[in-house]
Every structure is written in C-alpha cells, then in structure tokens.
Curated annotation (Swiss-Prot):
Keywords: Metal-binding, Metal-thiolate cluster
Alphabetical list of Pfam families matching this protein: Metallothio_2
Protein origin, superkingdom: Eukaryota
Family, as annotated: Belongs to the metallothionein superfamily. Type 15 family.
Protein name: Metallothionein-like protein type 2, MT2-22
Functional summary from the UniProt entry: Metallothioneins have a high content of cysteine residues that bind various heavy metals.
GO molecular function, one term: metal ion binding
Length: 80
C-alpha cells in the first residue's frame, strides 16, 4: 500500500520522511466546515554569500535528485 497516496517526501540521507504528505499542513487543510480566517506570513532571510563565496565550492541540496516511490522508499536514490 502506498504511503498516503505516495505523497511522502525525501529527507536528509535520502530517507523518506513526512509520510503524512497529504496532510502536510493540517492547520490549513479543508475540512468542509466553516472556519475563521487564517494568515500565512512569509519572510526573507539575509544572504550568506560572504562565508561560502571564498571557498569556491558549490552546494547542492542533499535530496535534490531523490524521489519517493509508491512504497515510501526513495527511488532512485541519487543524492549528490
């Protein structure tokens, strides 16, 4: 059986996490009932280029190439 319809996400180390993917944001889910208004506040963080620019290294997200299969196992696990 798939994990919540295959809606799980790959986390650190190419391990599947968040197998409640279909209910990722429970406070914002639609339940068919009348509810009060909700606000989502987004912010912007300052750039940290100065620390890493001098190193000459490029960083790639750890789970960039991972995809979760229907059984909630990362497929393929090609994290770089």
């Amino acid at each position: 059986m798939s994990c919540c319809g295959g809606n799980c996400g790959c986390g650190a180390g190419c391990k599947c996490v968040g197998c409640g993917g279909c209910k990722m944001y429970p406070d914002l889910s639609f339940s068919g009932e009348t509810t009060t208004s909700e606000a989502l506040v987004l912010g912007v963080a300052p750039s940290m280029n100065s620390q890493y620019e001098a190193s000459g290294e490029t960083f790639v997200a750890e789970n960039d190439a991972c995809k979760c299969g229907s059984d909630c196992k990362c497929n393929p696990c090609t994290c770089k």
